Amino acid sequence: MKTATAVINRRALRHNLQRIRQLAPDSQVVAIVKANAYGHGMIEAAHTFCDADCYGVARLSEALALRAAGITKPIVLLEGFFSADDLPLLVEHQLETAVHSPEQLAALEQATLSQPLRVWMKLDTGMHRLGVLPEHADAFWQRLTACRNVVQPVNIMSHFSRADEPEAGTTERQLTCFDAFTQGKPGAQSIAASGGILLWPQSHRDRVRPGIILYGVSPLDNEDAAHFGFQPAMTFTSHLIAVREHHTGEAVGYGGTWTSPRNTRLGVVAVGYGDGYPRCAPAGTPVLINGREVPLSGRVSMDMITVDLGPDAQDKVGDEVILWGPTLPVERIAAHTGASAYELITRLTQRTALEYVDGE
């Protein structure tokens, strides 16, 4: 019997990439495959996104793994390089890099490289995490344009902090700041990630950088991805390993936090926080068994959860349990837990098997 398994639908991944192209028809697509492709398996996802124009990762190790797997299209290091010692590897593997700090700029100026690198100057328009502040941006850009180790023209990127909020004045101010700096400068521009693609079409520019939306999960709190025409690619499943008679007033699980208000049947599911199911999921969080939703009962354990099947349930050991997927969106589970959907799909552990299908 299978236990925790994440089934990844390649057809859904391809559909989502094409949906991005429909929403941003004049932009190239940087498929973001960092963090193991948001839990979907980086190598498999990258090959499935073979029609993307480029890939985006957060770590040099991710980029090198893609190259080792035969990915030849451009790859952008979204956080840049972390040490001057990394620069020869970037040249060897033809990687593009963000440049956001004085230390990175100095390393580029001082390096002896066999050929120049394509770079993306990261402008801090309001995220205040990485990036060159606007008051320092012109001087920084001038040094990059004069650097012998940089392919010209210099590309420019930034990142929205609140693009998932339709009325956020912050996004408009960030876009105004970006426009003021990029006006008249050559090179590609990129500022829109998933939220910007969905809600701010004026931000699409030369390249868009879809992340979570590529996997059929919404970046918005109040709408799931299906509302925008995307298909969830992951179905997280396990199976019932026990069905037990449970009596009124009996508690279940660690701490006895849930007590049955009636005689019922409890199902024990072979999944827990050791597989990546959220430990913070409260009683009442739904799972799907035999086409109906049933509520979580008691605390999530490392290896198991218990669910209230109901007094007349006919479910049996071996029946499949859907924890999230197209028929039970992960956004709903996130709402129950107080965690974000980003967390849920990226926290699956090595014990959860990844399987790939090309079906509906």
UniProtKB/Swiss-Prot annotation:
The active site is at K34, Y254. Its EC number is 5.1.1.1. Substrate binds at R129, M302. It comes from the Bacteria. Its cofactor is pyridoxal 5'-phosphate. Catalyzes the interconversion of L-alanine and D-alanine. May also act on other amino acids. Gene3D superfamilies: Alanine racemase, Lyase, Ornithine Decarboxylase, Chain A, domain 1. CDD domains: PLPDE_III_AR_proteobact. Belongs to the alanine racemase family. PANTHER family: ALANINE RACEMASE, ALANINE RACEMASE, BIOSYNTHETIC. Signal peptide: none annotated. This is Alanine racemase.
